[in-house]
Each structure stands twice: as structure tokens, then as C-alpha cells.
């Protein structure tokens, strides 16, 4: 799926105080030794779960579209996710500290 564009807000912040190499499954941090999800597209570090504010992106939350960290930092900027916005783990951890739930976000092509 393509990353939706338009106006959004941060609906929920997940992962405060977690180590930057934390892997999440269904928004729950895995414990060391837990099996990794059966995907290469791991959600890591922090999650900013987006709510769509436009008619064209109103289903964003239901599609589980996040801004999140990744283990594939070399693919940042390439169309390689399932619709999420991937960031370097250190960068998404910093962004996480700077925004509150309800902060507005604009995603453009």
C-alpha cells in the first residue's frame, strides 16, 4: 500500500523510554528472546500512530499507518514500506520527544 498524503494528527505515541532497538508486534514491545514477527518490515524504536484528517485518508488509523523506526535505515526515502513513514531510530526517538498527541502532521508527495 502507498503512504497516504494530506493532513494528519498524532493520535497515539507508543514506546516512550524503550531502547532504540526495541521491536514491536501489534504495538507491544517484544522482550529479548521473543521470536521476531515473520516480516522484514519491523516496527522499531518508537511509534507515532497517525489519524487522518482528510476524506481521502480518514482510514489511516484503521490501516495502522505509523511514523516509526526501522532496521532498514539504508532504505529510508525509498517506497519500500506498507504505507508507514519510516525513520532512522535515533531520529524517530528525537521526534517522539518533540511532539505531543494531537500534533498536526502534513505528508506530501
Regions found by a protein language model. Give the residues of each.
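Exported/periplasmic cell-wall-interacting domains
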Residues: 2, 18-109
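Electropositive
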Residues: 1-14, 18
Amino acid at each position: 500500500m502507498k503512504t497516504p498524503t494530506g493532513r494528519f494528527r498524532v493520535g497515539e505515541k507508543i514506546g516512550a523510554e524503550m531502547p532504540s532497538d526495541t521491536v514491536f508486534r501489534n504495538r507491544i514491545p517484544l522482550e529479548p528472546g521473543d521470536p521476531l514477527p515473520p516480516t522484514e518490515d519491523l516496527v522499531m524504536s518508537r511509534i507515532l500512530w497517525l489519524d487522518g484528517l482528510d476524506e481521502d485518508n480518514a482510514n489511516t488509523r484503521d490501516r495502522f499507518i505509523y511514523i516509526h523506526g526501522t532496521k532498514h535505515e539504508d532504505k529510508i526515502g525509498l517506497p519500500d514500506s506498507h504505507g508507514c513513514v519510516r525513520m532512522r531510530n535515533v531520529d524517530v526517538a528525537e521526534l517522539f520527544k518533540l511532539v505531543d498527541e494531537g500534533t498536526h502532521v502534513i505528508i506530501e508527495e
